[in-house]
């Protein structure tokens, strides 16, 4: 599917299967989410640009590769997106973090923002938006609209699971934003849950219903 990268690494798929199981505990789910987010982050940052820096090892001076440009921004869609941050920040501790509380009004189809906090110079940074689920796509669409309004131009979206319906909606609104996911599942049910899915990621992560 154009514009969508499915991360099929065996460790990602194995951990995702355990997360799907209804008997997986809250603690287990949370631990697996941290582990899988680190693996997903590795893939979504695979093509970051490098430059060289003159360094001194214990033996000699040498030119060595380092990341080029301003620090990354990880943008979490509240609340479930926060579950992906811990593992990603362990991998990229210098990254900046944005938090976005936003939803789409189902009657007006307008984005309703209740919280937004982002680093400065977001227009000069790669922004990786994270949310475990791309179901209808409404929250992700609205969040990215808000980021673009504030100047973000280089954006990627990372999730655990995506539904075909959500992908279509998302790409219709933001065809310039690539999607990275561990799985494209079958469909949405009548309640808007991804099938086969893993349930409500936020509830399973925090032990709520």
Swiss-Prot record:
InterPro entries: PRibTrfase_dom, PRTase-like, Upp_B, UPRTase/APRTase, Ura_phspho_trans. GO terms for biological process: UMP salvage; uracil salvage. Its cofactor is Mg(2+). Keywords: Allosteric enzyme, Glycosyltransferase, GTP-binding, Magnesium, Nucleotide-binding, Transferase. Pfam families: UPRTase. 5-phospho-alpha-D-ribose 1-diphosphate binds at residues 79, 104, 131-139, 200. Gene3D superfamilies: 3.40.50.2020. The keyword Nucleotide-binding applies. GO terms for molecular function: GTP binding; magnesium ion binding; uracil phosphoribosyltransferase activity. Binds 1 Mg(2+) ion per subunit. The magnesium is bound as Mg-PRPP. Uracil binds at residues 194, 199-201. It is an enzyme of class 2 (transferase). Allosterically activated by GTP. Its EC number is 2.4.2.9. It catalyses: UMP + diphosphate = 5-phospho-alpha-D-ribose 1-diphosphate + uracil. Pathway: Pyrimidine metabolism; UMP biosynthesis via salvage pathway; UMP from uracil: step 1/1. The keyword Magnesium applies. Catalyzes the conversion of uracil and 5-phospho-alpha-D-ribose 1-diphosphate (PRPP) to UMP and diphosphate. Belongs to the UPRTase family. This is Uracil phosphoribosyltransferase. The gene is upp.
């Amino acid at each position: 599917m154009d514009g969508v990268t499915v991360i099929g690494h065996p460790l990602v798929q194995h951990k995702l299967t355990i997360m799907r199981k209804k008997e997986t505990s809250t603690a287990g789910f949370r631990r697996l989410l941290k582990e899988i987010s680190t693996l997903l982050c590795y893939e979504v940052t695979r093509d970051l640009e490098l430059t060289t820096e003159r360094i001194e090892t214990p033996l000699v001076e040498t030119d060595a590769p380092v990341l080029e440009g301003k620090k990354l921004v990880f943008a979490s869609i509240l609340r479930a997106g926060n579950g992906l941050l811990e593992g990603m920040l362990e991998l990229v501790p210098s990254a900046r973090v944005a938090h976005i509380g936003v939803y789409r009004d189902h009657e007006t189809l307008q984005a309703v923002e209740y919280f937004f906090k982002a680093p400065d110079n977001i227009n000069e940074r790669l922004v990786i938006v994270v949310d475990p689920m791309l179901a209808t796509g409404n929250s992700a669409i609205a969040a990215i609209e808000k980021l673009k309004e504030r100047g973000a131009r280089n954006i990627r979206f990372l999730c655990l699971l995506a539904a075909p319906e959500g992908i279509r909606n998302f790409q219709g609104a933001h065809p310039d934003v690539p999607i990275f996911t561990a799985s494209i599942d079958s469909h949405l049910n009548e309640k808007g849950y991804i099938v086969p899915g893993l349930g409500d990621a936020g509830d399973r992560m925090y032990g709520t219903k």
